[in-house]
Amino acid sequence: DAMVPALSGVSGRAAEPVRRLGWVYAPNGMAMDAWMPTAAESLKLSTTLSPLASYREQMVVLSGLAQGQAEALGDGNGEHTRATATWLNGVHPRETQGADVRAGKTADQIAADQLGRSTPLSSLELAIDQDFLVGNCDNGYSCIYMNTISWRDDTTPLPMENNPRVVFERLFGESGSTADRQSEFKKDRSILDAITR
């Protein structure tokens, strides 16, 4: 809710708190000494996590996990593709170069089924890269497995959006009028509340 201070004078009512959940995928890993908290009991945040200090009591930082379904399991090479495809679902993806992809519903979408019930968009799939590949990306695996980490169900990958303008318009409409958007903000205590109505 970083935008609350900028908009706090616009609203006089307290909105119902909305539960939010975020998943961050870092395909090439983390510098673990700058990522992991130093003491699990007190959750002394690392340099990387320190901007989230005000949420410390609401955080869970997991470590030591492994994704066995990302292993070859007889499919041969394709580790990068399988790592992306299995990250949030634990399902070994179907080895295919065609449209008959199959993985599994991801944890973010299971959560969105519950947390997104009272919001216009149950989930947002965002990316910072434009690397949308096509064809055979990794030893017999379709590129769709590398292009998305969220799956609505076993056969429906959810594309990620990396254009901030498109995301903004999806959330708040295509109105170019600042007055129209400001009118919408007056109904809520923060920009994030506008997407949870």
Please state what every model-predicted region is:
Residues 1-197:
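Ligand-binding pockets and gating/stacking loops
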